[in-house]
């Protein structure tokens, strides 16, 4: 069972009574056939549910109203099978607060050249019925997604499935609670921001809990539960000599397991699916949570360090979007550079907290080593390299009057040398179009040093995310040129200024 099993997408057919009952009967039959086929053959992430035909303003308004109040409904897919006068949709679309996709398709793929007549033409009017629907969306300044293609086309299936992932993630985000253990890292700007504005825009709430509250739960974990979890560690990871039974750091592993169990219990009891920590606020914890955070991220929790609630929420959102896809998604930080003519590289990592979902090793190394930050006992962590191939890094920032999503397309590469003295998980990549352009553009756009790294998602996914939430997106990829990029930032400033 995945998170998508908790949601459904409604399939709505637009028509009218002008064409008579026989035409509407055929429309209904076509709709049933298409929905059944899509649910069976299209490998969609969640179920399509066919709703009654929308043939009058009252029927359409009722469908939209019901969609708003049904928590299982993640969005609407609308098919204008015949011509459906768009004034009938105004009241419904005015109140609709769920994502909307217009499926611009028709029942038949090929025209029946020898038998086509006006009955066929009146029944299959997507070509101009869809344009009428598009006009009212533009007139109402309501942007919605559009997918054109036959309902048996695999590319159409993939695009609808991708949109469904966005719709489910948006609905899930409305219920997302972010827990901050402690506050923001002192004097850091980009990790701070307006939590009220974020809840208005995205729906997730952000609140702070004292680390002492967490410590109480951690200390309540039984030794039996700790030992059972460490047994799981033994089977899942390659334990270094220091972490094995009778090893000099074995107690640190036991303590890391206790922290993991305590954190998970705290998050489950509070209904949290994203959280932050900060090494400046660890009172009562024996070590900075490293292994615990890594494993919780792998289970789908959002996380970011230093109180960075925006990145923690974004990671959770992207975890939901990428559920079931190939490749992992993790908290990340651009840490240091390798400058070499024609081969500039970025080494990404964090103090401890990189998600094992992006690991290339089947069994990462579990080790305990010194950490000079935080002033606590040496923390346990998983150490691994990252899968190679195309990926993205994304950052969500608060500009005061709006949110900006930055996305850099990257290519992860194999680490050319063993990092024998680097005791943390890491990723190595080439930034597109090149490191000077990418880093300068990122800095000019105000991108954070914390990001979400993903092999599972791509630029199109993040474009859909930005469009669905009506936020600015700034893209850095192989097509980026700095003069045009700077112009786009200026134009966006004017555009969003007019929308205030």
Swiss-Prot record:
Mn(2+) binds at residues 306, 333, 350, 450. Its cofactor is Mn(2+). GO terms for cellular component: cytosol. Binds 1 Mn(2+) ion per subunit. One of its GO terms (molecular function) is manganese ion binding. The keyword tRNA-binding does not apply. Pfam families: AraA_central (PF24856), AraA_N (PF02610), Arabinose_Iso_C (PF11762). It is an enzyme of class 5 (isomerase). GO terms for biological process: L-arabinose catabolic process to xylulose 5-phosphate. Keywords: Arabinose catabolism, Carbohydrate metabolism, Isomerase, Manganese, Metal-binding. Catalyzes the conversion of L-arabinose to L-ribulose. NCBIfam families: PRK02929.1. Belongs to the arabinose isomerase family. This is L-arabinose isomerase.
